[in-house]
Amino acid sequence: MESSNPTTPAPIATYIAAFPPEVQARLLAVREAIRALAPRAEERISYSIPTFWQGRNLIHYAAFARHIGLYPGAAAIEVFRAELQAYRHARGSIQFPLQEPLPLALIQRIAAWCVDNNNARPVSAPPARPGRASAGAAPGRTRR
């Protein structure tokens, strides 16, 4: 089943379409909740799952056999630790069971925090590539 939203990027729509309709609906709800708070973010597949990216990864989400996974990073888990007690969570991930209602308000608060945290951090330039040694002797060696 293709996404009902024609603006869903093709790789994301393909990812979502691979799941049963009830899981697709949950993935779309998570996507829309995050998109509302990260309108400038680019959507892409990273680590084989849907990702919102804005100079760096903001937040990922994914579907599994028994849960929807949300991956906001370790710092977000620490900030929202008290609100996450009802859910399985680890260093940078949260599991929302498929048989329970999605906590969309919590997902939006986490997404808003991720956007704010990202906007507060400068985007670092990629590291400069070291120059190539000229053909000939290796550094520190002389020719005879």
PLM regions and their residue ranges:
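Charge-dense, helix-prone N-terminal extensions
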Residues: 1-144
